[in-house]
Amino acid sequence: MAIDENKQKALAAALGQIEKQFGKGSIMRLGEDRSMDVETISTGSLSLDIALGAGGLPMGRIVEIYGPESSGKTTLTLQVIAAAQREGKTCAFIDAEHALDPIYAKKLGVDIDNLLCSQPDTGEQALEICDALTRSGAVDVIIVDSVAALTPKAEIEGEIGDSHMGLAARMMSQAMRKLAGNLKSSNTLLIFINQIRMKIGVMFGNPETTTGGNALKFYASVRLDIRRIGSVKNGEEVVGSETRVKVVKNKVAAPFKQAEFQIMYGEGINTYGELIDLGVKHKLVEKAGAWYSYNGDKIGQGKANATIYLKEHPEVATELDKKLREMLLHNAGEFNSAASDYEDNENEEMNNEEF
């Protein structure tokens, strides 16, 4: 028993020393019924927020979004920016592809007047800008579009046809080591958009891979695979695309969940259509034949009319969104300092001794 008490005192002293040297919260104790309270930003899609488990993309972490061309990668990140700006957060867009369309971004709800934008010349410059913005502590969301366009300086200064084996992978590996800690301390969300490449000579298994080496795969807390799986038509005219997002990796909740939603051309994610579908699935919206009803009131005949009703009555849409989030998302608990627990125990013992 005396040995246990000595161990407890030694541990309390060690924890106190660590926190004194490295700051409060530098070492934590995971209680049995506690989980880390991760702050998140909505993706703009309710079904994807639910699939992610935490209610959105986690702050202070690295996220990778990859998929084929025209699958909705940039659209999804612009929706994240719009959602973050609505919460009063500061966002930056590192446009390495030099292809950002400000008119389209504005249509998706992005406040382009307050969006920081950079079009770097080299990959090193892009990543240094990311690091500088992160260390400032004043930027909440940074988007890099895309990893494939982060060209090392040596490759740009060289000639076409020169061999530059592993340069991009080495550059990304160094950047990840430098950025990861800074992102956590400044609580900045860094999203990398990535492209797909094919491995040569793969006979079995998935031949697809992403650019930039393996470092990003390891450092990313969330990896999203986004694919276009169909078209949305209005008569004969194609007005959007059916999109599926798979959570390939998730360090803040259970992975491998999927979300399906529509991306409408010129409008972005069809959030009202998602509310109708999820409302029907979880019995918050009643469907009788072609008619949709909410709280006993008919809101439209057919999904298109029900969607229009929600568009015209945003207070109803907000109420339905809130109910679905409360039903489908779990709130995380508190995450306390280990040293403070021992300090509390010691204080209690001292108080008991006084009496």
UniProtKB/Swiss-Prot annotation:
Write out the GO biological process terms: DNA recombination; DNA repair; SOS response
SUPFAM superfamilies recorded for this chain? P-loop containing nucleoside triphosphate hydrolases, RecA protein, C-terminal domain
Q: Where's it mainly located? A: cytoplasm
Q: Does the keyword Ion transport apply?
A: no
Cited CDD domains = RecA
Q: Which Gene3D superfamilies match?
A: P-loop containing nucleotide triphosphate hydrolases
Query: Where is it located?
Result: Cytoplasm
Enumerate the residue ranges of region (Disordered): 336-355
Which sites bind ATP?
A: G67, P68, E69, S70, S71, G72, K73, T74
Any Pfam family the entry gives: RecA
This protein is called: Protein RecA
Q: Where is the composition biased (Acidic residues)?
A: 341-355
Transmembrane annotation, as ranges: none
Q: Print the keywords alphabetically.
A: ATP-binding, Cytoplasm, DNA damage, DNA recombination, DNA repair, DNA-binding, Nucleotide-binding, SOS response
Please indicate which superkingdom the organism of origin belongs to. Answer: Bacteria
| Role this protein plays | Can catalyze the hydrolysis of ATP in the presence of single-stranded DNA, the ATP-dependent uptake of single-stranded DNA by duplex DNA, and the ATP-dependent hybridization of homologous single-stranded DNAs. It interacts with LexA causing its activation and leading to its autocatalytic cleavage.
Sorted alphabetically, the Gene Ontology cellular component annotations on this record are: cytosol
Q: For this protein, what is any one GO molecular function term?
A: damaged DNA binding
Question: Record keywords: DNA-binding included?
Answer: yes
Please give the family membership noted in the entry.
Belongs to the RecA family.
